[in-house]
Regions:
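PLP-dependent enzyme catalytic core of the Aspartate aminotransferase-like
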Residues: 325-329, 337-366
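Conserved PLP-binding catalytic core of the aspartate aminotransferase-like
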Residues: 142, 286, 295-329, 352
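C-terminal segment of N-terminal export signals and the immediately downstream linker at the start
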Residues: 23-68, 83, 257
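Phosphate-binding glycine-rich loop
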Residues: 76-115, 129, 133
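Active-site pre-lysine segment of PLP-dependent enzymes
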Residues: 149-158, 173-193, 197-230
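PLP-dependent aminotransferase-like
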Residues: 108-165
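PLP-dependent aminotransferase class I/II
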Residues: 52, 220-304
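N-terminal export signals
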Residues: 1-28
Length: 366
């Protein structure tokens, strides 16, 4: 990223110039303040910094094309994604966010006789899409280490789709790469493994890996990605999946024609070409997250080891009153997850937002 774009990005974010190292979160003594009318939003695992400057410019320029259908832009993005992952274009399908990929997978491969198996807790949308297809949803609790219990999940009979969110939402935890490989190898060919890698870019553990390179060997593997997280485009909706062509064809049968919009396609294309934005975003998130975790631990709370842009705090008390009290203090945190009723999910925002979070959290939990 050149110096001009660094200055522009810093000004847009309102936090000064982008730097390789940032000042400690809690070294400053000035009182925190809310950055947004209505409170600080740490509830949806969004990227507080937004898209890269190049992506924002591309989306602005694409407004001149909104009178045209998106066919050419779709083809261009598919080509870029295929090249990125070293597959042919017929291995790629686009979606309005990775949520549409989940919906297409449920529609194509689950039914009243083919179940959807998922962890508990995990991202709930897959269960909703499965029920819309008339499929039974089987929930398997996470292990004590907050990993997917893949052996139990694979053992569910008549499974049409097994959904694995890795890193997992809402726990920010990972499932070991060796266990994932063994799981994929053990599945019958008529059971689809849908691996959701929405938070892939934030994971840096040596025990984690993307399974996209395994697609060529696994005819029953679908891998979902999104532009909503590290790329900062949650509001514009764009995602994709990688799978073998036979699966892509079945998913395309469930997809609306020309469902993508040219603005999102332009932003996604530019985002994939701006690798510096990803590197800087990961660095910012990691440093801010680590300092927040340290502050929370100093208050005596356990935090699930995080490989994402959010954390899960074990409050050892019912979480609903804390959620409500945090909101009353101007900080919106994650929703209640019934499988973990004493855990609080918190998105990692900007350093200033997280100072406000720590102050409010200390007050609420005192």
């Amino acid at each position: 990223m050149n110096e001009l774009s660094r200055r522009d990005l810093g000004r847009l974010l309102g936090i000064g110039a982008v730097a390789a190292t940032l000042p400690p979160l809690f070294a400053q003594n000035q009182p925190p303040r809310s950055l947004r009318r209505g409170g600080i939003r740490l509830s949806a695992n969004e990227n507080p910094y937004g898209p890269s400057t190049s992506a924002a410019n591309a989306m602005r320029d694409a407004m001149r094309l909104v009178n045209r259908y998106p066919d050419e832009a779709q083809d261009e993005l598919v080509t870029t994604i295929a090249k990125l992952h070293d597959v042919s274009a017929d291995h790629v399908i686009l979606g309005d966010g990775s949520s549409e990929i989940l919906k297409l997978t449920a529609a194509a491969f689950s039914s009243p006789t083919r179940k959807v198996v998922m962890a508990d807790p995990t991202f709930e949308a897959m269960g909703e899409y499965a029920r819309a297809s008339g499929a039974e949803v089987v929930k398997v609790p996470l292990t004590s280490a907050y990993a997917h219990d893949l052996e139990k999940m694979a053992g569910v009979p008549s499974a049409g789709v097994i959904y694995v969110c890795n890193p997992n939402n809402p726990t920010a935890s990972i499932t070991n790469k060796q266990n994932v490989r063994a799981f994929l190898q053990s599945l019958p060919q008529d059971t689809i493994a849908l691996v959701d890698e929405a938070y892939f870019h934030y994971a840096d553990s040596p025990d984690y890996e993307s399974v996209i390179p395994l697609v060529q060997m696994r005819p029953n593997l679908v891998v979902a990605r999104t532009f909503s997280k590290i790329f900062g485009m949650a509001g514009i909706r764009c995602g994709y999946a990688i799978a073998q062509p036979s699966l892509i064809r079945r998913m395309n049968q469930q997809k609306a024609w020309d469902s993508m919009n040219v603005v999102a396609l332009a932003g996604a294309q530019a985002s994939l070409l701006d690798t510096a934005h990803v590197v800087e975003g990961r660095k910012r998130n990691s440093q801010t997250r680590d300092e927040v975790v340290n502050a929370v631990k100093q208050m005596g709370y356990e935090v699930v080891p995080s490989q994402a842009n959010f954390i899960m705090i074990n409050l050892r008390r019912t979480v609903r009153p804390v959620i409500d009290s945090m909101r009353a203090n101007g900080v919106h945190v994650g929703r209640l997850f019934p499988a973990l009723p004493q855990h609080l999910r918190v998105t990692i925002g900007t350093p200033e937002e997280m100072r406000s979070f720590v102050t409010a959290f200390r007050t609420v939990t005192a």
